[in-house]
Design a protein with these regions (language model features):
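Extracytoplasmic electrostatic interaction patches
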Residues: 166-238
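Membrane-embedded alpha-helical segments of integral membrane proteins
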Residues: 17-60
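Non-catalytic accessory regions used for complex assembly or targeting
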Residues: 12-15, 27-35, 46, 75-76, ...
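Juxtamembrane loop-transmembrane helix junctions in multi-pass integral membrane proteins
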Residues: 7, 36, 67-71
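N-terminal export/targeting and maturation segments
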Residues: 86-163, 168
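Transmembrane helix-loop junctions in multipass membrane proteins, especially transporters and channels
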Residues: 28-35, 61-65, 95-103
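N-terminal membrane topogenic signal
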Residues: 3-15
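Cytosolic-side transmembrane helix boundary signature
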Residues: 48-84
């Protein structure tokens, strides 16, 4: 069957394989979202694959109709060019969907927090003896920030590791080194705009562009409230 499809429309067969691979790469992150987002992303990701697969089947079914085969091959070439524009649109729409529908289930933590950069501060896995675990991940689109946040309550916090790695230690309002860098430090965390100065920030990495307003920047830190045993890990870049 596959040999027959390949023989009658080689170009369509090639793009069946290519589009399946691209679709799988686009769809992967949607697996961790709601069922509605999964279904929408599934359609956007695999639509070109479905179209070229149907074309391949038609080429096989109509192999003896030379006129039909000629038309199908012309349509295949046209769609080959059009799919480039389609993927630009689909990637943008999927990126917006992923950004507006963040991952908040802690059981998916290890799928997203696995790079060396993140694990400089974030734990490689969520400790079992902690309470009130909350996780947040959302990729940025255009000027929006990409954010990773982990929050929990831990009665056995060890500060030594953070002190060794920190380039700066203090509360949010005490930070004056880079204008605007930590203005949204606690966004997407459970304590946003609430008792922010009760947390001591251990800033591991922080930098901004030369705009003086931090239009583009990045920070990585752990923030700890020793009175309540709350700890927040966060990476944000925009």
């Amino acid at each position: 069957m596959l040999k027959e499809i390949k023989k009658n429309n080689k170009l369509a067969f090639i793009f069946v394989i290519i589009n399946f691979i691209i679709g799988t790469l686009l769809f992967y992150e949607a697996l961790f979202r709601s069922i509605n987002i999964i279904l929408i992303t599934l359609l956007l990701s695999y639509l070109p694959f479905i179209i070229f697969f149907i074309i391949s089947l038609l080429s096989c079914h109509l192999k003896d109709n030379l006129k039909a085969i000629k038309v199908i091959k012309i349509v295949t070439k046209i769609l080959t060019y059009l799919q480039v524009f389609y993927y630009f649109m689909a990637i943008f729409i999927i990126a917006i969907l992923m950004s507006l529908n963040p991952v908040t289930n802690p059981k998916y933590y290890k799928f997203f927090v696995n790079s060396d950069e993140l694990t400089k501060v974030f734990p490689k896995q969520i400790p079992k003896n902690v309470e009130n675990v909350q996780f947040y991940y959302a990729p940025g689109v255009l000027q929006g920030s990409t954010d990773y946040v982990l929050y929990y309550i831990d009665e056995n916090i060890n500060l030594d590791n953070f002190k060794e790695k920190a380039t700066w230690i203090g509360t949010k309002d005490e930070y004056t080194e880079v204008n605007g860098l930590l203005s949204g430090a606690f966004s997407y965390t459970p304590i946003e705009y609430k008792n922010e100065d009760s947390f001591v920030i251990y800033l591991i990495e922080g930098n901004c562009d030369d705009s003086k307003y931090c239009n583009h920047g990045k920070y990585l830190f752990a923030a700890i409230n020793e009175n309540t045993n709350e700890i927040i890990y966060k990476l944000s870049f925009w």
